């Protein structure tokens, strides 16, 4: 009797892990220093390496992508009740970050081909209460950053990009984190690059970096001075080391992800009721 060959699943996303021995070797010094959190040497090293990799001027590491967005919005100090234009086609975290800052999300429709926010519909949603736009890059497809930033400049709005799906993406040779007033990244275990849990805020502003440095550490500026109502949103050293290890392999992992997307597109091409997103190279 011939046994039927077991079919193997092709996972679109599966947590990328560095070689076990490599990670273990890097965490050994922690048993000597006992410095496990509070912006230790590995936290600082990862900030520097990601700043270079993502081609951004400033980068602040945080405990996850959600807190990165929530604190980036908090740092802008918008008046309570102000409106923020965003997309409903995103993980719930995007909307939660707006609402938790006591702001009102205003949903803008998306484009059917790449699922990013439809920039042609943004201006009709702007009111006297609008203070910002939070566009979301989707599945590696980036928003129309040029049009969005023209609209923002015309109406005096801030732009905070949710770039959780856009690690390593570039536009006209600029890292995607260079656009807007800030861009947030997620390093969750499901992402193509992960620190187990983690996130970051990229920007051109040193002032924003320093503001986030305080906010993610309970608003503490010094032993005797608390200048903001912050929270504990610091990345720990074990997560930072995972990030340092995984950064060596992220280019390979991105290529693996691209091959899987190609395979899915090929296998689903004959199904008339399905349409996959358009991806620009």
Where on the chain are the PLM-derived regions?
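Conserved active-site segment immediately N-terminal to the catalytic lysine
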Residues: 161-195, 222-227
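PLP-dependent aminotransferase class I/II
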Residues: 41-49, 53-59, 120, 124, ...
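N-terminal "arm"/small-domain region of PLP-dependent enzymes with the aminotransferase-like
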Residues: 1-36
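Structural detector of well-ordered beta-strand residues that form the stable sheet scaffold
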Residues: 60, 85, 106, 159-160, ...
């Amino acid at each position: 009797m011939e046994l039927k060959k077991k079919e193997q699943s092709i996972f679109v996303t599966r947590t990328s892990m560095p070689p076990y021995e490599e990670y273990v070797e890097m965490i050994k010094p922690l048993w000597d220093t006992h410095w496990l959190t509070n912006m230790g040497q590995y936290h600082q090293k990862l900030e520097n390496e990601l700043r270079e990799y993502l081609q951004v001027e400033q980068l602040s590491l945080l405990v996850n992508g959600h807190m990165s967005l929530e604190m980036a919005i908090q740092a802008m100090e918008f008046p309570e009740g102000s409106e923020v234009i965003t997309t409903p086609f995103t993980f719930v975290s995007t909307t939660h970050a707006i609402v938790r800052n006591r702001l009102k999300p205003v949903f803008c429709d998306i484009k059917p081909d790449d699922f990013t926010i439809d920039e042609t519909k943004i201006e009709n949603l702007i009111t006297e209460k609008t203070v910002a736009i939070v566009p979301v890059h989707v599945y590696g497809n980036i928003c129309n950053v040029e049009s969005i930033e023209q609209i923002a400049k015309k109406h005096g709005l801030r732009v905070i990009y949710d770039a959780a799906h856009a690690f390593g993406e570039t536009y006209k040779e600029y890292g995607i984190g260079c656009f807007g007033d800030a861009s947030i990244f997620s390093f969750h275990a499901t992402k193509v690059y992960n620190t187990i849990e983690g996130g970051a805020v990229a920007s051109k502003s040193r002032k924003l970096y320093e503001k986030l440095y305080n906010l993610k550490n309970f608003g503490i500026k010094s032993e005797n001075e608390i200048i903001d109502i912050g929270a504990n949103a610091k990345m720990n050293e074990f997560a930072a080391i995972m990030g340092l290890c995984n950064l060596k392999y992220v280019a390979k992992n991105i290529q693996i992800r691209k091959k899987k997307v190609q395979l899915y597109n090929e296998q689903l091409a004959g199904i008339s009721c399905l349409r996959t997103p358009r991806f620009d190279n």
